[in-house]
Amino acid sequence: MNKMIPRVRFAPSPTGFLHVGGARTALFNWLYARHFKGTFILRIEDTDQSRNTPQALSVIFDNLSWLGLDWDEGPLPDGSSKGQFGPYFQSQRKEIYNEYCNRLIAKELAYIKDEAVYFRMPRKRIIVSDLICGDIYFDCSLEKDFVIRRKDGSFVFHLVNVVDDLEMQISHVIRGEDHLSNTPKHIALFEALGMSPPLYAHIPLILNPSGTKMSKRDKGSSVQEYIDEGFLPQAFRNYLCLLGWSLKENREIFGIEEAIAKFDLPQIHRSNARFNHQKLLWINGEYMRSLPLDELYPHAFFWLKKAGLIDQNTDCSFLKQAVGIVREKVKTGKELVEWMKPLLSDTLQYDEAVVQQYLDDKGKEILREALPYLEEVSSFQAKELEAIIKNLSLKMGRKTADYIHRLRVALTGRTVGPSLYPMLEVLGKQKVLNRLYKVVGPKE
């Protein structure tokens, strides 16, 4: 039965940033829809008018788009929508909810009390047949009737959730395990309306490293934080997959097409998933190094432009080469920006302690030894430069590291950075010589 062509939905509230848990819920729904060639619906639960903001709605659109989670039905950023089951904003569906509410009242399955409408909760055992958690039995014999329409005319989550799932023909409800306790009420509402409920699949919670539930107040709980840090969407999406699901062979790096091909609900773990920032960093670093440079470059261009280091007039050929050598050493876009600074600007910042250690009189002497050999190089290719420095160190009776460390500090102002010889090649002969003479003094 769970192999029917699915219609699934992601229904966030536009009241703040997109939570990591919400992003994972969206991803799992999207993967399920794509795997079975079904429909992924975006629905906006904006019934809390006092907390809704246009900015939060924009963040939902932007973050889902950044993750590559395209929706088949739902509202669009330009104010339009696509799909035949709209409106896709709950605030625009009040007449629909009133109709269903009145239907329940007419059948005496709901009643008015103190101007609010209460649903008569059946006093019986309700079974939730969950595709992940299995059969769960809820004893509702002592369950109280609950409000479905408030005295001010606004509707409570339980009714609108059920009505929208019914009207939009949702086949599978894939959501966080924290909603499991609501499910008996939802099943009771479906039965009261004479309809079969969708299939339910409650996915495990995401926990902080300490083991507590990750809440919206926790640092690192917002998708936007990872965008701002310069995480790649491919890597972040890959990591979200691992928060409750994995490939059978337990391989941790995989592309989205492989995830689509292999994703299914029975493989989702029962135990809660702990968010591991170090593993996310590792995965992002793997993607930084392994993505085709042409695929990484637009991200790098965006990060560097946002940081004010480049503009539309920047030499793209040089920039791409520089990104190509820096990406081997960094894990995030923010790190890449920091490492690119000395490559993009001739105004270098030298730490006094570093100068004393590497650019003292002895250091300058070592640089002067290297300069004539660098001046004679015609091709200025990494392999040739490496051979020259190694031969020079043998000739002068020094360690190769004596030249490497001082060249790096003289050229970047730093003790760490991209591999030296590729960096020399990318900077180019003239820029290298100019920077070295600026350190050791003008050519005699």
Swiss-Prot record:
Protein location: Cytoplasm
Keyword Nucleotidyltransferase: no
Keyword ATP-binding set for record: yes
Any Pfam family the entry gives: Anticodon_2
Predominant subcellular localization, coarse grouping: cytoplasm
Protein family according to the UniProt entry: Belongs to the class-I aminoacyl-tRNA synthetase family. Glutamate--tRNA ligase type 1 subfamily.
Protein name: Glutamate--tRNA ligase
Organism: Methylacidiphilum infernorum (isolate V4)
Source organism phylogeny: Bacteria, Pseudomonadati, Verrucomicrobiota, Methylacidiphilae, Methylacidiphilales
